[in-house]
Each structure stands twice: as C-alpha cells, then as structure tokens.
C-alpha cells in the first residue's frame, strides 16, 4: 500500500522526517514532488501576485 512521508535530502541521502516501518536494506521507490512553497518561489516574479493572494491560495488548500 503506498504511503506518503516527508523526507529531507542531506549529504546524498534521503532522511525520513517520521518513523517508517521498513527492514534494513529494503528497496523502495521514491516519487519526488515539490512543495507548494517551492513552486511559488520558483515562479516568483513571473506572475503579479501579492503576498495576500498567496496566503489566500494556501488557506483555500488547507
């Protein structure tokens, strides 16, 4: 069954931010997705959005 966990990438290694139920050496597949804030930063300046617009957008998705 697929699970979604957050991880941080440090020194060439993905480190989960929560406990995972895996055996040592077990192989898994990772799907890398950008967080919404990463996407906003990436396109910042390409669209005319105010901070208020961004806050409203994020609030609607919570």
Swiss-Prot record:
Coiled-coil stretches noted in the UniProt entry, renumbered to this chain: none
Endoplasmic reticulum as UniProt keyword: no
Annotated keywords: Toxin-antitoxin system
InterPro entries attached to this UniProt entry: AF2212-like (IPR008203), AF2212-like_dom_sf (IPR024069)
Entry similarity comment: Belongs to the UPF0165 family.
Role this protein plays: Possibly the antitoxin component of a type II toxin-antitoxin (TA) system.
Originating species: Archaeoglobus fulgidus (strain ATCC 49558 / DSM 4304 / JCM 9628 / NBRC 100126 / VC-16)
Protein's name according to its UniProt entry: Putative antitoxin AF_1095
Pfam families with a match to the protein in the record: AF2212-like
């Amino acid at each position: 069954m697929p699970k979604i966990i957050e991880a941080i990438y440090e020194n060439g290694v993905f480190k989960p931010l929560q406990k995972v139920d895996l055996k040592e050496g077990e192989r898994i597949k990772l799907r890398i997705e950008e967080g919404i804030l990463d996407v906003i930063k990436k396109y910042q300046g390409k669209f005319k959005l105010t901070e208020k617009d961004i806050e409203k957008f994020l609030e609607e998705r919570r």
